[in-house]
């Protein structure tokens, strides 16, 4: 088991979730409150939640499986933000900031999954 609060990928995912809650969700149109806004909310907090849940598992294999789920959620968030950009709910500038964060989290998750699946050989995360 790992202390998830010490994991850089969790820290980044947590800050991203806070950013989405504070800066993106409040500007979403009212008509999307029970549809797209809820889906973005769930997918966004699913990323750090899966990291947390996986960190409580006893094996690297199990932890990596939860990180796979977190990675899937990043892909879901990635598309949701393409959609709200194309619907003009957010500006291109806001999208670029969000997309950069999502890509950083994805890269961190992929590296961590590889690290766990390779038996922690020759790498430090």
Kindly give the residue locations of the regions a language model identified.
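Short, C-terminally biased terminal segments at protein or domain edges
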Residues: 1-125
């Amino acid at each position: 088991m790992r202390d998830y609060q010490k994991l850089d990928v969790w820290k980044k995912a947590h800050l991203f979730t806070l950013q989405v809650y504070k800066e993106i969700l409040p500007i979403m149109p009212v008509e999307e409150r029970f549809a797209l806004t809820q889906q973005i909310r769930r997918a966004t907090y699913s990323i750090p939640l899966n990291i947390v849940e996986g960190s409580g598992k006893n094996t690297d294999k199990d932890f990596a499986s939860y990180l796979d789920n977190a990675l899937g959620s990043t892909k879901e968030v990635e598309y949701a933000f393409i959609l709200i950009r194309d619907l003009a709910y957010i500006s291109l500038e806001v999208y670029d900031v969000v997309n950069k964060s999502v890509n950083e989290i994805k890269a961190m998750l992929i590296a961590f999954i590889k690290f766990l699946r390779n038996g922690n050989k020759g790498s430090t995360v």
